[in-house]
Amino acid sequence: MSAASTEERRPVHDILGIGFGPSNLALAIAIEEHNRDAAESDRLSCAFFDKQPRFGWHRGMLIEGTTMQVSFLKDLVTMRNPASGFSFLSYLKDQDRLADFINHKTMFPTRVEYHDYLEWAAARVGHLARFDSEVLHLTPVPEGFEVVVRHGDGRLTTARARNVVFALGLEASVPDGARLGDRVWHNLDLMHRVGELDGTRPRRLTVVGAGQSAAEATDYLHRTFPEAEVCSVFSRYGHTPADDSPFANRIFDPLAVDHFYGAPEEVKEQLMSYHRNTNYSVVDLDLIEELYARAYQEKVRGEQRLRMLNASRVTDVAEGPDGVAVTVEFLPTGEREVLDSDVLVYATGCRPRDPFPLLGETARHCERDERGRIAVERDYRVRTRDELGGIYLQGGTEHTHGLTSSLLSNGAVRAGEIRDSVLRHRRAARSAPDYALSRG
């Protein structure tokens, strides 16, 4: 009997998660907490598949000393269930660091510590996750969906579920025409690839981008390679500080999602425009001041190892075996300079991974708005034309749900809303007359 046919004999899952980063991890915890207190008939069965060999969240950006830009209280659970045993505070207690963290007097743990928290939480629901397992496509079936999975050893298996939840995370975004290569990296891979420079004594490193990731990459490379010139190229005249003021931060509140979802399209566009400086192409003020102070002290000493090439853009990139020639244009004058660099790092942002290649023929049943964007209900369920199982999106919903679509800020609440939506639809299905007849 084939592995696929063996899989088909298993019960149909209520929820099948595709991807197991922070968003679907929060969902797994929400399901686990529901099942702990629910009667057996009300529990949810679930499984999560992730193509990574083990849990990981942006490992290539885990620069030592960098801090989270979101409060630890916006962890996997607290905004949904402050009493949860999966909170960041519970993690600290388990690690015997609670008092130490309190004495640290910060709301923002380092990224390395927060990643350790995520790994700790993932291990506690590890029985729900299947790593080294890539979902290839899904097909509608009477029970919901049949999902084909390729495992690390090459086996293909199938699983069935009434609902699927996509949480595919982010992928690198680079300028049109740009190509990554041996000497051209994206900052998502910075910590994975920086070891390639060991023993090479690089002379010049160039970073392109205007946001937090670009500033962090610039700072890290400048500190790590004390003999190298580090050039930061960005089109603004100066780095823009992130607006993390209290009133602006309300745009990340759960209530703001309600307001945004119900707003007219022109109001949504206004809100996105007003508050882009909370998240996009902005830098923490402390880091801006640190980079400026460093550049100034170099000027005092009569050297210039940190170069901030503001109001500039890259016009050409020529990669060779020993380096990459980066042509930079100063926008006010049009003057061009070629930077012969050992490495070029694009820190030009990320975009949500598109789930629709996995949907196959199912995609034609998904409704779209007048702009061709996917139509999504308030509970993150894709609106479909026919009676399909539930398709839920964690990410890629900025046009309907606002800035928190791909951020950690609302992850705990969103997970609870998706779980509760699945329960609500299941109750409705069970109360239908044809369900009672089929059970009789």
Predicted segment positions?
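Short Gly/aromatic-enriched secondary-structure transition segments
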Residues: 63-66, 360
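Flavin (FAD/FMN) cofactor-binding and adjacent substrate-gating region
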Residues: 67-100, 259-267
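Short, flexible, mixed-charge acidic loops at enzyme active sites
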Residues: 63, 91-92, 181
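Charged, low-complexity intrinsically disordered tails and linkers
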Residues: 50-51, 57-60, 69-76
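Flavin (primarily FAD) cofactor-binding/catalytic cores of flavoenzymes
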Residues: 1-53, 59, 101-212, 216-440
